[in-house]
Every structure is written in structure tokens, then in C-alpha cells.
């Protein structure tokens, strides 16, 4: 926990994972093992610099995940700034890409690339990523407060229930399409055999 006039820098795994906590931030490390790092940040603001290296034994990249009250953040070797107030989480990607999903529906997610921001409110899907002008990016990075994310004109977010229903419809339509393709291939094979 950082106080009103306190900041903290946390380095894990040497210089691979660095988190700079701003004032009034609640932060917790849930797990730190050879496969992944999981942290929790219910309130506050932080800047994350994550270099994903291969786990030598398993030949795969370590995972780094951040959980807030509303969002699940999947990090892919990147740098980003995130602010959360409990009911809302905003993030700006400075380098690489970050995946943001709703805690209540992890299948509903957006990928936020370099120079883009997204916001997730309780009961909503993440907003579509929006490009943030460099001056506003600097303001967000330099400020101790999450309030600077309020200067970003985020597009409207879809209701989470609506987004989940749409996702299910798309998946069902895709399954039907795949089944039709398989049936058509089988018919073509039967015709060739005759």
C-alpha cells in the first residue's frame, strides 16, 4: 500500500518485471512462480514494464496477469499504465500489447496495442481501444492520479450481458458453418468414390 505522498518501485525476477506504484495504491502479489506472475491492484495507479522471457525448462513464455475489481489484464511483454478505482479500470499501452477482459466474463476481451487505451466499468464490456494523442499519453504517464484517464474520450461500452450473448451467437454460427463444411466435404468425397 502506498500513502498520499508515497510511491514505490517493485522489481521482480531481476529486471524482467518492474512495477511503479503511484500514490494511494493498493497492490498485492498473489503468485510468483516459474510459469507466471499474478498480481492484484484493487485501487490506485501503476506503470508496468514487463519483459517476458522463456521459462528454460518448459520452453514457453512466463505469464504475467493483473487483476482489478473489474478487469483481468493479460500482459505480453509490454509497458503500460493502469488506473483503477474499484468500479472502473483504465489502461494505456506504451509498448507491446495488453489484453483486457471483464472479471465477470473473461471471454469478452479486447487487445490494446501501443498508443491505445481502453476502459472497463462494472457491468460493461471493455471499450473498443482508442488511439490516445502523445500529449495526453504523457499526461497520463506523469500524473499520480487515475483521474487523467478521464481526459480520454472513450467510446461507449456495450453491456456485458449483451456482449456475452453476442459472443455465444457468433460461436454457435461458427460451429454450424464448420459442420456444414464438414458435411459438404463428406458429400464431395462420396461423389468422388462413386
For the regions a language model picked out, list residue spans one by one.
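Flexible, surface-exposed loop/linker segments and immediately adjacent secondary-structure boundaries
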Residues: 1-178, 182-183, 188, 192-194
